[in-house]
Amino acid sequence: MVSLGGEFAWAQQSPTVTKSPLTSTSDLTIAVLKEIQDIEERAVAIAEDFPDNLYNSYRPKGDQDVRTAAEILLHIAEQNYSYASLMRTKQQQEALIASGKKPDAKDILTFVSKQDVVVKVKASFAAVREAIQDNPDPKKIEWWLYVIAHSNGHFGNLVTYYRDNGLVPPTSRQ
């Protein structure tokens, strides 16, 4: 091996391996649930705050192929329910269906009112939390992370909608 010496000596040192602060499934679950709570709070803040006159009408550049704020929020809710279902065991899914508590995707995606959107978004995140708590299997982490990434991606879209209209999103006010 060639000695790098001098200012590059650090490059030859073995990296220090540090233990992850997540030492158990419980720690991982808690960390994921915290991230889900964070994006839920931001999504609900927008669902409650986005101006009524733009809520289900504004589309960037008037493009009919682009979702309105209401449609984005309902899409987040529908996907949350879908992935909450995938986080559950088959037995848990069957019990949910039998109880009549599994909502229909078409019903979730139907715009009724701003308040209805807020209720659906909140309920969908509650379904995700419940699914994780009922089945905290770390093998399901891809679904957990999908909820976080998907919701955050659409949160970014919604922030852009605020900015496009000369408004400040609730998460940027202080």
Regions found by a protein language model. Name each.
Residues 102-152:
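Acidic/histidine-rich alpha-helical segments that form the ligand environment
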Residues 9-20:
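Cleaved targeting-peptide boundary
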Residues 38, 42, 120-123:
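Charged, amphipathic alpha-helical oligomerization/scaffolding segments
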Residues 22, 26-34, 57-63, 104-116, ...:
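Second-shell loop/turn segments in exported
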Residues 33-37, 44, 55-101, 137-174:
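Short, contiguous alpha-helical
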Residues 2-10:
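C-terminal segment of classical bacterial N-terminal signal peptides
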